[in-house]
Every structure is written in structure tokens, then in C-alpha cells.
């Protein structure tokens, strides 16, 4: 029963990210493999190869934020150590091996991600405002797997 409640709570957290962000990037080993964006009146789903080239684009007609959250949850659960998400505006976050990246480009941590984001292109990263663990608190999904985080 606790596991089911935990799963539902985690899906709710992801749905909140989907609703508040508008764009969610899915990363495997810190490489963007997919993007889900809300555009106009529907969600769009993009996939990329390791060189950040667009592989496919799909219109998810009829999808709801709850459907999208469940899809992301199932994807994360397959490999919570390597699968991460990045959520777009207004709370822009990137999960990179327990590090967050930051708008202060003087921070060392921003440089690698900035290279990745500019190579992916502005159509993928609508907002390059990134946070850092030195400046804000956050929890990566690998830590959310513990049910007591919700108590």
C-alpha cells in the first residue's frame, strides 16, 4: 500500500513539473534523448540521438498532464540512476549526477551544460536559466525514490 501511495505521490510531483514547466527534457547519462513540450493546445514529443540531432517529432493529441507524468514516471523507474528530467520555465532545473547548474556563468558547473544546451539549440532550451546546489535546494529523482521524503 505504501509503495502505491509513494508512486501516486511521485506521479503527482512529476505532473506538477509538467504543468509548471511547459517543457520537460528527458536525459540518459546526461544526454538529452527526448523533449515533451506543451505547444498551443497539445503536447509534442521529440526524440534525439546522442549528437542532439532530431530523430522524430510526434503530436500527442489528447494527452493530459497526468498521462505525460505517468509516461515520465515509467521511464524514470526503468533506470533511476541514469534517467533524469529537466523542467523548463518558470522553475528551470537540470539534474546532472546530483548537481544543478546555474545562471551565474562564473560557476564552473555551468560550463559543460552550457556547451550541451547551445549545441542542442534554442528551440529545445527555451530558457537557459539554471540553478546550482550552492544557491538553492533541490532533490534529484534518485533521492525521491525514498518514500519518507513525503512525510
From Swiss-Prot:
Coiled coil: none annotated. Belongs to the asfivirus A151R family. Binds 1 Zn(2+) ion. One of its GO terms (molecular function) is metal ion binding. Induction: Expressed in the early phase of the viral replicative cycle. Monomer. Homodimer. Interacts with protein B119L. Interacts with membrane protein E248R. Keywords: Early protein, Metal-binding, Zinc. It comes from the Viruses. It comes from African swine fever virus (isolate Tick/South Africa/Pretoriuskop Pr4/1996). The keyword Oxidoreductase does not apply. Its cofactor is Zn(2+). May participate in a redox cascade for the formation of disulfide bonds in viral proteins. This is Protein A151R.
Amino acid at each position: 500500500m505504501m509503495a502505491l501511495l509513494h508512486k501516486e505521490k511521485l506521479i503527482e510531483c512529476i505532473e506538477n513539473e509538467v504543468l509548471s514547466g511547459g517543457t520537460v527534457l528527458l536525459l540518459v547519462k546526461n544526454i538529452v534523448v527526448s523533449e515533451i513540450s506543451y505547444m498551443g493546445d497539445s503536447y509534442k514529443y521529440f526524440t534525439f540521438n546522442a549528437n542532439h540531432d532530431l530523430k522524430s517529432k510526434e503530436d500527442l493529441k489528447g494527452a493530459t498532464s497526468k498521462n505525460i507524468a505517468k509516461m515520465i514516471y515509467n521511464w524514470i523507474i526503468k533506470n533511476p540512476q541514469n534517467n533524469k528530467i529537466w523542467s523548463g520555465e518558470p522553475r528551470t532545473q537540470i539534474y546532472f549526477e546530483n548537481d544543478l547548474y546555474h545562471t551565474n556563468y562564473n560557476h564552473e558547473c555551468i560550463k559543460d551544460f552550457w556547451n550541451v544546451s547551445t549545441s542542442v539549440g534554442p528551440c529545445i532550451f527555451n530558457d537557459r536559466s539554471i540553478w546550482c546546489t550552492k544557491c538553492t535546494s533541490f532533490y534529484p529523482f534518485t533521492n525521491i525514490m525514498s518514500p519518507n521524503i513525503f512525510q
